[in-house]
Amino acid sequence: RIRSIEVQGDSAAVRFHQPESRIQFEHPWPRPMVTTDGHNSAFYLTNARELLDVPGEWYHDMNARRVYYYPREGEKMQEAEVMAPAIETLVQVEGTLDRPVCHIRFEKITFSYTTWMRPSEKGHVPLQAGMYLTDGYRIDPKMQRNYLNHPLDNQGWLGRPAAAVRVVAARQIDFERCRFEHLGSTGLDYEEAVQGGVVRGCLFRDIAGNGLLVGSFSPAAHETHLPYDPADRREVCTQQQINNCYFTEIGNEDWGCLAIAAGYVGDVNIEHNEISEVPYSGISLGWGWTQTVNCMRNNRVHANLIHHYAKHMYDVAGIYTLGSQPKSYVTENCVHSIYKPGYVHDPNHWFYLYTDEGSSFITVRDNWTEGEKYLQNANGPGNVWENNGPKVDNDVRERAGLEAGYKDLLNIQ
């Protein structure tokens, strides 16, 4: 949220509201400014009448309580249908650890038109995957951790964005052939303490935030670099099956969001999905920036098709992992067609596959990518990389993505 703009010659001094201003400028990487190595940190300004210059854009004058809209070609405002969402969550399925909600199936239901007001009211400083910082500090000099982990240059505490459909403390809550469209934040969120659940044949389209979230991304009072391994294993999201879904036009407002983001999860299977037109990575698996063993294990990302990704953000990959995840696999996926936006922090910091800090005991095998641009950053032990790149059997490329019975999702208007 902008507090003031003061023009100074050919420049302008922009000041932001608190607390987000302090939190953002404490953020260690990428720094929100031009750095000494010449890397850029761009700012994207919205909601000013002067910026209303492209058809389809709008401006909300909050003082006058008036909305200005620049019509697209052929649109007539006298005949326009306008949707102004007023609710953040449409459906909430919530039990307790001792009395979970069980065996509910949603089939052929459309979930549409939600909002999310927190960024307008309190600001929004995202860390990653749409998780926003409620507080954060830079650490100088860096804090030494145990021998397994790199020194720590920051600490952060996170909040979780709203979702159109929330599932908490439940078992086997399924979504078959549903549509999640025109949403102001996350589409579907298996938030905490959920066992089982199938998401199959669903369309996720035109969503401001993440398409689908699974599992904890650090509880609110838990510093985000600490491993999460609750004594009561019922708190962990496990055994979700996400397959044959189509994700497109995700993260339209919050550019650090993904089609599918799974945090501290176990036995999760993500396969035969197609992902396109996303601002950042396609699939993110894991959390924590630590090699320390935690509750994550036995996860599988298999035969997904990811293309036309990274529309706005770098430090990115088609498939991205974090943290120690014994017996986890990234196999037979197809990744191609990355965008090349001109304003990213570092124009070379993009990849097809990316195992980030603490990634351990993960097998990355037989993935078709149009080049061999990968990153293994501050990884732990036990990772296996075998047979990835453009020379992988073309059958892998052909099999990736939606299976025959679900290709109709690509043609839904």
Feature-to-residue mapping (PLM):
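Extracellular polysaccharide-degrading/modifying enzymes targeting complex plant/algal/animal polysaccharides
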Residues: 1-169, 174-177, 220-231
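Short, solvent-exposed linear motifs at loop/edge-of-secondary-structure regions
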Residues: 1-8, 63, 311-327
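Short strand-connecting beta-turns/loops that link adjacent beta-strands
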Residues: 7-10, 63, 98, 193-195, ...
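Structured core elements
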Residues: 15, 68-69, 189, 211, ...
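Active-site lining segments that contact anionic ligands and/or coordinate catalytic metals
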Residues: 55, 64, 257, 280, ...
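Extracellular beta-strand/beta-solenoid scaffold signature
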Residues: 85-93, 122-126, 131-132, 151-166, ...
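Right-handed parallel beta-helix
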Residues: 102-113, 151, 171-185, 194-209, ...
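Extracellular beta-rich repeat passengers
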Residues: 117, 343-413
